[in-house]
Structure formats: structure tokens, C-alpha cells
Amino acid sequence: MKIPRLTVVTLGVADLQRATDFYAQVLGTPPDTSNEGVTFIRLPGTWLSLFPLEHLAHDISTKVTPQRGAFSGFTLAHNARSKEDVTAIIERARSAGARVWKEPQEAFWGGFHAYFSDPDGYYWEVVWGPMFEFTPDGALKFTEAS
């Protein structure tokens, strides 16, 4: 069976209300639903789910490892439509309480990007690149760089 797309990204969070408020401000959209201890935010083509970390670990049948804040080799990314959008999103994240690790700047590969982490330590790249385009429904499409 082929998996056609990633449908939900779930982040285990220490404080559900804080995380819900943070992402509503950064993403500029209210949660679609927030009840029974989980928040769902609809994004084009996928959902962002926020779930209390201890409950998520219990649901998986594992334990929480106390390494929050250390870089684990995992990032999430948002592809912006312009360099200006990268800067605006980073400023929105900063004002919502994010820690900015890399200010908006030119990337070695010809794009423009920045990095921040949310209050739970998840790292995000906000990026624009000349090889990124969007379909009418907002899906990312890679093209030849000029």
C-alpha cells in the first residue's frame, strides 16, 4: 500500500493552552477544534495536532525522555511565498514567544531562510526558494531553479 501524503503532524506539548495560543498566533489561524485534551489546526493539505506530551507518550506506550531543548536532528518547515513573508513569519513567531536561532538571511543554496523553536523546543525552518512554487490549492511544487 502506498502512503499518498502526510495527513497529520502531532507535537507532544508541555502546556496545551500555551501551545494552542502560540500556534494560533504564529500560523494566523485559530484552531479548528480544541477539546478533550487535544488541539487540531487545519493547514493546507494536512493537520497540526497538539497533544499533551505525557498523554501522547502514554498513548504510544512509552515514556517521556527529558531531553527537551536539545536538537534531535528533526525540524519542521514552512515554505513561504517570498523573502518578505519569511521575515514577517519570523517576527510573528518571535512576538508569540519563539526563540529565533537564525535570523532571516540568504541561504548557501540560493534561498532565504530562518530558524526558530517553539515553547516546547520544536525547531522550525521558514524558507523561501526560487525552486519552490505553489499549486492553486497551496501544495508545494519543486521546479528547476533558474
PLM-predicted stretches and their roles:
Residues 2, 5-14, 39-42, 63-146:
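Vicinal oxygen chelate
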Residues 1-20, 73-78, 130-146:
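N-terminal beta-strand motif that seeds the catalytic metal site of vicinal oxygen chelate
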